[in-house]
Amino acid sequence: MQIIVRDNNVDQALRALKKKLQREGVYREMKLRRHYEKPSEKRARERAAAVRRARKMERKRMERDGIK
């Protein structure tokens, strides 16, 4: 990953770097890898995330279609 420092403005470059890392999910990955996660716990976490995504998509679909 490369960030260009323009006009010796390191603060702006750091903000850009943090934004890029956030967008690519590096912080989330670091948090997950901080401790070992058992395969069963990983499956449960991923299953819960899938349920949350499905519910969110259903809510958005219902909102878009005008159903409440």
UniProtKB/Swiss-Prot annotation:
It comes from Sphingopyxis alaskensis (strain DSM 13593 / LMG 18877 / RB2256) (Sphingomonas alaskensis). GO terms for cellular component: ribonucleoprotein complex; ribosome. Residues 37-49 have a biased composition (Basic and acidic residues). Keywords: Ribonucleoprotein, Ribosomal protein. The keyword Ribosomal protein applies. Residues 50-59 have a biased composition (Basic residues). Residues 35-68 are annotated as: Disordered. Gene3D superfamilies: Ribosomal protein S8 (1.20.5.1150). The keyword Ribosomal protein applies. Belongs to the bacterial ribosomal protein bS21 family. This is Small ribosomal subunit protein bS21. One of its GO terms (biological process) is translation. PROSITE patterns: RIBOSOMAL_S21 (PS01181). GO terms for molecular function: structural constituent of ribosome. The lineage of its organism: Bacteria, Pseudomonadati, Pseudomonadota, Alphaproteobacteria, Sphingomonadales.
